Every structure is written in structure tokens, then in C-alpha cells.
Regions:
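Fe(II)/2-oxoglutarate oxygenase catalytic core
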Residues: 1-156, 164-189
């Protein structure tokens, strides 16, 4: 059993789908990504984004493939950590963010995905897809576990959204990185 609760699933998306999603991102109007309350500070986070993208209303190749993959691999994460279903009902939230990091760009600051702000308080898990392999850094660093998850095409990573899993991007100075990230949240019943 994985004791750091960071689930890494390789080949969660096939290469041809990853390439289609990269084309999709490159064909969209990208905006400078902010953090938390939408504030922009390039020392903290420097990224170009398509956001927020609603799962149900998008109707794109992206939503279709991400949804199918998440349905399959959420079960795998649940099976690895069965106690997760003992607390409350949860499911993927209905939006996600597509991101493009040009060389030198990145999420520089250590952060977590549930910081107590009203717009993210119900996040319980994070999911992240890498759409391309970055051989010059480009992964995600979890300092609490001294663990780096490399950016590998088709890889899905799932981890808790809380302070126990603060993380930051590892900036590539030479290569572009494409990802999608979103969250699983508690369902108010």
C-alpha cells in the first residue's frame, strides 16, 4: 500500500489523446493564471490557462477523455485507500483547468489545494494529468515526503488536497509542459 497517499497511474491516457489535447490547448485563448482569489503574482504562479472548463457543458474531446479516465482510475485510488469512503460522499468536481507552462514558467510556490477559502473548501483530493513528457525537470515536488513525481505523458496523479500534501512545480527551463488539474470534492447531501 502507498503510505504517502500520492497515487500515480501511468498510461491513464493514450499518447494520441494527449497529443490531441495539446492541440486543443494550443488552439484556445489562454489567460495568465492566478492563485487563490485570482490574484496574479508571477513569482508565485506563472502559467497560461484555459479555465474554468466545465465537465458537463464543454462537449470537447478533452472533457470526454478526462471523464472516462477519471471514472476508471478513481476506483483504483479508492481500492488502495478504502477508508476514504468512510467519511462522506465525494465525486469529481464539475470543472477543471487546462494549463500550459512555457520554459521558465511554473507554479513556484509551495501550496495546497484546500486552503480554507470559500471557493476551495470542499476539495478533498486533487487530480492532475500530464499530457507530455518533460525530461528537463517539469514534475511536481512534495516536500513533506521528499518525493518528485515526474511529468510523463499520459500519467495521472491523485493526492489529498490538504496541508499534508503541500507541493510545487519543478520548472523546466527548456521545455513546455501541458497539464490538466481538477479536484474531487465532498457532496452536500
Amino acid at each position: 500500500m502507498n503510505t504517502d497517499f500520492i497515487g500515480v497511474i501511468d498510461d491513464a491516457l493514450p499518447s494520441n489523446i494527449c497529443k490531441e489535447i495539446i492541440k486543443y490547448i494550443d488552439g484556445k485563448q489562454l489567460v495568465q493564471g492566478g492563485y487563490g482569489n485570482g490574484e496574479i503574482d508571477l513569482k508565485y504562479k506563472d502559467v497560461q490557462e484555459v479555465r474554468p472548463v466545465p465537465f458537463l457543458d464543454d462537449g470537447s474531446i478533452v472533457s470526454d477523455h478526462l471523464t472516462k479516465s477519471l471514472m476508471v482510475y478513481t476506483s483504483s485510488y479508492r481500492n488502495s485507500h478504502p477508508a476514504i469512503d468512510e467519511i462522506s460522499s465525494w465525486a469529481p468536481l464539475n470543472y477543471y483547468t487546462l494549463k500550459k507552462y512555457d520554459p521558465g514558467q511554473g507554479y513556484h510556490a509551495v501550496h495546497c489545494e484546500n486552503s480554507g477559502m470559500s471557493n476551495n473548501i470542499n476539495r478533498m483530493l486533487v487530480w492532475l494529468f500530464y499530457f507530455n513528457t518533460v525530461t528537463d525537470a517539469g514534475g511536481t515536488f512534495f516536500p513533506e515526503y521528499d518525493r518528485i513525481v515526474d511529468a510523463v505523458e499520459g500519467r495521472l496523479v491523485i493526492w489529498p488536497a490538504y496541508w499534508t500534501h503541500v507541493h510545487k512545480g519543478i520548472v523546466s527551463e527548456t521545455q513546455t509542459k501541458y497539464i490538466a488539474s481538477g479536484w474531487y470534492g465532498f457532496i452536500n447531501e
